[in-house]
Amino acid sequence: ATNDVITAWIPAQAVPIEMGPLTFAKPLEAYKFVEDIEFNEFDTSYDKKISDVFKNEQVSIVEEPFELGEVSFHHNLSFHTAPENKTTQSRIVLANTYFADGARVIKNPTMISGDWKKFIPETNPGEIVSSDLNPICWPVINQI
């Protein structure tokens, strides 16, 4: 798998704290504290374990509102989440993910990998990402 991945998180409106803006754990290496915690889609035990570890390790959590027009660019190793939207208005966001030419799907995708098959169709774990939905924007060219 590659670590050459970045996501642009683009809200379509202002996102106040009550709406659940994108939230980050800092520093970037914070993911290492929780990378072995097993994801559970049926309850909140995963979230509780993450919260407990970050508290014990004194990991800083950055939660700030987004103004209209602001964009977040974040690395795939940056531990992030979007808290619950406590308003009656939908939180509308476009997330575009970009990765290096030659990137591969991780060999063992998990529930936390999300619905990756929807976004990288016709590609199996361990294979180079190559599908009609994932065009090469800037190909790597062998240089002498």
Give the label of every model feature segment:
Residues A1-I17, P65-L68, F73, N96-D101:
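Short, conserved beta-strand element in jelly-roll/cupin
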Residues T2, P11, P27-A30, E84, ...:
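Short capping/connector residues at structural and topological boundaries
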Residues N3, Q13-P16, E57, E70, ...:
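Residue-level signal for the start and early helices of compact helical domains
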Residues V5, G20, R91:
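Conserved catalytic motifs of the protein kinase core domain
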Residues V15-F79:
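Double-stranded beta-helix
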Residues F39, V71-F73, L77-I144:
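Non-heme Fe(II)/2-oxoglutarate
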